[in-house]
């Protein structure tokens, strides 16, 4: 994973909102070794549908909001998701994710692109659902993701992700996230993969204005 990351400031506002971000996926980009777009896209969406099905009737589902990408595709994401769980709540697709991240208590990223780096850049508690073969990642990324799995950040199955969410429901998320061994790995990961933009204020304002 690699991205140009704005130096985002964490907002003082907090809520119980958990945001699950669905990324635009037309095929794999630089961090994936092979172009297996269609098969991997189907696997990605199938596992999200499983996760949403598992949420039905769960208390934690009351706090979860889905953020779709504003660019539509032939996959009809929203229709598929609602067919598995008609109670899902969605955020405004046109609103910038940057504006949403800082006010949430937890972010669920579903793809190892720029989105997860933006969450980590402000040290926002973040879980990642990564259902693909780790061998598709380059060696350096794979080493980190294996560590993230052990630390409870990355989850390979919808069932594992739900179990972690239910565990954190009864814990102080900030305390869990800021555990020293977790923060040490995250710090090294950000140093390796996040390129922070020195003109942070000007660039961030452009992004917000164009969102």
Give a label for each model feature.
Residues 15, 61, 103-105, 149:
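Short, well-ordered alpha-helix to beta-strand connector turns
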């Amino acid at each position: 994973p690699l991205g140009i990351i704005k130096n985002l400031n964490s907002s003082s506002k907090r809520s119980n909102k958990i945001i699950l971000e669905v990324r635009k996926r037309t095929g794999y980009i630089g961090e994936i070794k092979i172009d297996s777009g269609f098969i991997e896209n189907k696997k990605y969406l199938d596992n999200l549908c499983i996760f949403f099905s598992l949420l039905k009737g769960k208390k934690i589902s009351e706090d979860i909001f889905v953020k779709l990408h504003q660019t539509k595709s032939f996959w009809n994401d929203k229709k598929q998701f609602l067919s598995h769980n008609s109670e899902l709540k969605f955020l405004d697709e046109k609103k910038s994710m940057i504006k949403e991240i800082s006010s949430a208590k937890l972010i669920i990223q579903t793809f190892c692109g720029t989105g997860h780096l933006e969450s980590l850049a402000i040290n926002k508690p973040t879980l990642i659902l990564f259902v693909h073969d780790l061998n598709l990642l380059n060696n350096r990324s794979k080493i980190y993701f294996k560590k993230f799995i052990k630390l409870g950040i990355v989850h390979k199955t919808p069932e594992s992700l739900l179990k972690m969410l239910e565990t954190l429901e009864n814990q102080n998320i900030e305390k869990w996230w800021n555990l020293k061994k977790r923060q040490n790995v995250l710090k090294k990961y950000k140093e390796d993969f996040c390129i922070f933009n020195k003109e942070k204020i000007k660039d961030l304002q452009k992004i917000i204005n164009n969102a």
